[in-house]
């Protein structure tokens, strides 16, 4: 039986009223129309709609005001930083010269001539300690080389 009884010759009329995309596209409007037709409280829905619109517009205004305030604060801060005269931090009067020299000195804020031995009192001199850093780095280097040799050996053993 090549043709189903009750359908057209090409057997496609059964799908003529089935439009899933169209029904999805119109679902929202159909629901809105249904609610408007059967709504027992039309004034309530209108006031709720107006209230929602008012809240949305007010929140938009508040957001815009906050954004403009933040932009203004950022611009003020940026211009305030750019208006700083950094030459004030490098003044050449004796007090600032002494202060700057003492801040850059490793000898406990001494601004005396440290190349002259009588000027260096023991509290201003850095502690004398033996230098063990080179030994530590030599050991670290040996450990790393041994680790690399071990990894290479394990890779070689696993490939055999």
From Swiss-Prot:
- Which chain regions cross the lipid bilayer? 137-157
List where in the cell it is found: Host membrane; Virion
Q: What keyword terms does UniProt attach to this protein?
A: Host membrane, Membrane, Transmembrane, Transmembrane helix, Virion
Keyword Membrane included in the entry's annotation: yes
The topology of this chain with respect to the membrane is: Single-pass membrane protein
Where is this chain primarily localised?
Answer: host cell
GO cellular component labels: host cell membrane; membrane; virion component
For this entry, the protein name equals Uncharacterized protein R557
Q: Source species, please?
A: Acanthamoeba polyphaga mimivirus (APMV)
Query: What taxonomic ancestry is recorded?
Result: Viruses, Varidnaviria, Bamfordvirae, Nucleocytoviricota, Megaviricetes
């Amino acid at each position: 039986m090549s043709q189903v009884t009750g359908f057209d010759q090409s057997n496609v009329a059964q799908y003529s009223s089935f439009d899933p995309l169209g029904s999805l596209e119109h679902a929202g409007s159909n629901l809105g129309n249904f609610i408007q037709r059967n709504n027992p409280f039309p004034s309530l829905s209108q006031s709720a709609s107006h209230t929602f619109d008012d809240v949305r517009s007010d929140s938009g205004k508040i957001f815009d005001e906050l954004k403009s305030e933040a932009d203004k604060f950022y611009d003020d801060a940026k211009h305030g930083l750019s208006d700083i005269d950094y030459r004030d931090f490098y003044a050449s009067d004796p007090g600032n010269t002494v202060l700057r020299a003492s801040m850059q000195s490793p000898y406990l804020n001494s601004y005396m001539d440290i190349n002259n031995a009588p000027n260096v009192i023991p509290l201003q001199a850095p502690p004398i300690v033996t230098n063990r850093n080179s030994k530590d780095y030599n050991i670290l280097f040996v450990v790393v080389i041994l680790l690399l040799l071990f990894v290479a050996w394990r890779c070689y053993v696993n490939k055999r």
